[in-house]
Amino acid sequence: YQYQGKFFQLSDVLGVDKEVGFTLSHDKYNTVDPNHFIVEDIEGEIDFGEGMASIYGHGENYQIIRQHKEFAQLVTNTYGAGRSVYLAGLPYSPQNCRLLLRAIYWAAAKEDEMKKYYVDNVNAEVAAFEAVGKIVVINNSLDALDTHLYVEGNLREKLRLAPMEMRWLDI
């Protein structure tokens, strides 16, 4: 329920609030700007699961990236020197893992560091073990896949991975 006029007590930080019937007379102009770092390599629709109804953008610095039936599903906001990301729901899928990874990098204002060790296929992942000079690229799918491995933001190599393969490489 609402407390002090807000459903989400951190609505100023999150950039969203929930309509519960007390602010129906207020105009809510939810315009979508789908271009954002968080969704740059997301293909197709994002699965928000059951999601959340009646969520609208709130404040001065929010950006609605995705919405459904005029209700916000993915919203970014700047607040003071910080950033926040609101997701209406996020069931597990490889694409949602990538979405969450990108959201974390954006919220931390570390977008430039995301491709220190990076693969561009959402069904693959990479881990670096700098102390021993190794990288592992993992195919998380039951199908063969192609991916590009980036190190320090530069394309290192193109890889073809067998289903569920883990490939070790030298850094």
Locations of the language-model features?
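A conserved amphipathic helix/loop scaffold
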Residues: 1-171
